[in-house]
């Protein structure tokens, strides 16, 4: 039996194994009815909005409705379980993101293994987080924050939207690489008190997703220090990267699409081709930029490789942090 990582990569490469005539027949008949995109988070977030953009694109390209269904709960695990159990016919898809990679080590009792039970289709967007501090603090740069934290060990706090979220893990990675002692304060979403506490200085810093932070930063309610990607963000190009000060640091959110394992390779191939076509469309590129993201094109094998690498990376951070969700 193949290990989960190898099986996931094998599923991604399986398209090439089908005869070309068979692949063409599958591609021409699909889709013949509406297709569900399952999203494991509430409507309105960056990943949800990006998935809706992609669903609309596929609806227009393939002549059938691709609609988003939000299945909220357990950091997207409920949604993943639903899709794993769905028929492998291409009519139920899931938005995968970095949370799924983190969950693999954060939860001990998952009933599924993404690397074994899903077939990668395509990645489509990468979005950085942004390191932002309270404007009440005398801190304007990443080095100044590190110096402040070292001068106040165990007294500096960072807010997140919950245990195991990308915001939490971004902070844990920063903590480890900077060699500082800062305390994690989880909220049920930053909008549920987290933003207010950082603004007033009750909590000192957060590593929030960029899209919901932009207006707060521009209004002066939060002070941005850097983005967590390896390159500057087009949405806020004036900000440096954390990696400028901590070489090797990277903690971007990313989004992609997968289907139940066993989905015909021709369907995976066609969906991948149509999604990649979106990145050549000026309107689509502008919509992704409006969400603070950059396109993330590639083959199913590319997405499988990204997911496997991210699963291993965040497993190390989860272990280092001691975080557990069950």
Task: Please provide the spans of the model-predicted regions.
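A ligand-binding cleft/hinge motif common to bilobed small-molecule-binding domains
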Residues: 100-109, 168, 173-177, 204-238
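C-terminal lobe and pocket-closing loops
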Residues: 126, 212-280, 309-312
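An extracytoplasmic/periplasmic, membrane-proximal ligand-sensing/linker region
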Residues: 32-34, 177, 218, 265-326
């Amino acid at each position: 039996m193949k290990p989960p990582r190898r099986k996931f990569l094998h599923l991604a490469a399986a398209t090439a194994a089908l005869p070309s005539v068979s692949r063409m027949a599958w591609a021409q008949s699909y889709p013949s009815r509406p297709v569900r995109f399952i999203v494991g988070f509430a409507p309105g977030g960056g990943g949800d909005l990006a998935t809706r953009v992609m669903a609309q694109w596929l609806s227009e390209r393939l002549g059938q409705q691709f609609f988003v269904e939000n299945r909220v709960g357990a950091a997207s695990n409920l949604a993943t379980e639903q899709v794993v159990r769905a028929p492998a016919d291409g009519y139920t898809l899931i938005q995968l993101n970095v949370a799924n990679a983190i969950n693999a080590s954060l939860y001990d009792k998952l009933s599924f293994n993404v690397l074994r039970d899903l077939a990668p289709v395509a990645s489509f967007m990468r979005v950085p987080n942004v390191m932002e501090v309270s404007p009440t603090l005398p801190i304007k740069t990443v080095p100044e924050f590190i110096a402040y934290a070292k001068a106040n060990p165990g007294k500096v706090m960072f807010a997140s939207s919950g245990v195991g979220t990308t915001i939490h893990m971004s902070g844990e990675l920063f903590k480890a690489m900077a060699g500082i002692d800062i305390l994690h304060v989880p909220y049920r979403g930053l909008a549920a008190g987290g933003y207010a506490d950082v603004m007033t200085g009750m909590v000192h810093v957060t590593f929030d997703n960029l899209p919901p932070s932009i207006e707060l930063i521009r209004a002066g309610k939060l002070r941005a220090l850097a983005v967590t990607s390896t390159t500057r963000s087009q949405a806020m190009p004036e900000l440096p990267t954390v990696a400028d000060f901590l070489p090797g640091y990277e903690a971007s959110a990313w989004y992609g699409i997968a289907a139940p394992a066993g989905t015909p390779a021709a369907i995976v191939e066609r969906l991948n081709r149509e999604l990649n076509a979106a990145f050549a469309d000026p309107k689509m590129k502008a919509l992704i930029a409006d969400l603070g993201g950059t396109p993330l094109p590639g083959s199913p094998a590319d997405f499988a490789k990204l997911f496997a690498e991210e699963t291993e990376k965040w497993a190390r951070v989860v272990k280092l942090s001691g975080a557990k969700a069950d």
